[in-house]
Amino acid sequence: MTRYKATISYDGYAFAGFQRQPHARSVQEEIEKTLTRLNKGQTITVHGAGRTDSGVHALGQVIHFDLPYQMDEEKLRFALDTQSPEDIDVISIELVAADFHCRYAKHSKTYEFIVDRGRPKNPMRRHYATHFPYPLDVERMQIAIKKLEGTHDFTGFTASGTSVEDKVRTITEASLIVDETGQFLTFTFSGNGFLYKQIRNMVGTLLKIGNNRMPVEQIDLILEKKDRQLAGPTAAPNGLYLKEIRYEE
């Protein structure tokens, strides 16, 4: 068997998430169906580096799969790209070692979260930016977001029901910028891994801080007490993008 690593992007609006699930459309299943057709009906299993939720987008998701033959990478990329649904793009494909696993190989991820604070909102971006039409103090949020950098126990920002026991993660970059129109905010988070709904919970908390409904020091309190009830609401999924996954050499 020959193992391939692919970088893909997708519009998450019409998907129930990346991971295959019964009675719902998923990115994994759509790519597997296309690869199975290319493999003359023989089933191909796709593995993903990240499991994005329903409505979450990806600019640089990474997958891997095995084929029983070797094929030119660009020809394979073109075939998979053109025969996959319109809301999935295959950016690149490369041959990798047989023991490479996109999820378990050491890597870091970068996510972006886009907020539309326009009044009214931009209707063309309604599936691609989370609307928050309330006053926001950007400087307060920029101070607060820096408190998330470093190695912390992020239990207070994790959704209930997660089976992960070790909730210590390292965030190497946490930043917030505003576009030139002042309407769109982009939150960026890079790190060695993120917990279930962690980014959406962090953004929901930062928006509350920006709206003066929580103090800037609330971030310190949440990290110290490890209490989800102290954090803000979970931000909607439509503003979240898996931007990039970087593997160590």
From Swiss-Prot:
<feature type="binding site">
    <location>
        <position position="111"/>
    </location>
    <ligand>
        <name>substrate</name>
    </ligand>
</feature>
<protein>
    <recommendedName>
        <fullName>tRNA pseudouridine synthase A</fullName>
        <ecNumber>5.4.99.12</ecNumber>
    </recommendedName>
</protein>
<dbReference type="GO" id="GO:0003723">
    <property type="term" value="F:RNA binding"/>
</dbReference>
<dbReference type="GO" id="GO:0160147">
    <property type="term" value="F:tRNA pseudouridine(38-40) synthase activity"/>
</dbReference>
<keyword id="KW-0819">tRNA processing</keyword>
<keyword id="KW-0413">Isomerase</keyword>
<dbReference type="Pfam" id="PF01416">
    <property type="entry name" value="PseudoU_synth_1"/>
</dbReference>
<comment type="function">
    <text>Formation of pseudouridine at positions 38, 39 and 40 in the anticodon stem and loop of transfer RNAs.</text>
</comment>
<dbReference type="InterPro" id="IPR020103">
    <property type="entry name" value="PsdUridine_synth_cat_dom_sf"/>
</dbReference>
<dbReference type="GO" id="GO:0031119">
    <property type="term" value="P:tRNA pseudouridine synthesis"/>
</dbReference>
<dbReference type="InterPro" id="IPR020095">
    <property type="entry name" value="PsdUridine_synth_TruA_C"/>
</dbReference>
<dbReference type="InterPro" id="IPR001406">
    <property type="entry name" value="PsdUridine_synth_TruA"/>
</dbReference>
<dbReference type="InterPro" id="IPR020094">
    <property type="entry name" value="TruA/RsuA/RluB/E/F_N"/>
</dbReference>
<dbReference type="InterPro" id="IPR020097">
    <property type="entry name" value="PsdUridine_synth_TruA_a/b_dom"/>
</dbReference>
<comment type="subunit">
    <text>Homodimer.</text>
</comment>
<feature type="active site" description="Nucleophile">
    <location>
        <position position="53"/>
    </location>
</feature>
<comment type="similarity">
    <text>Belongs to the tRNA pseudouridine synthase TruA family.</text>
</comment>
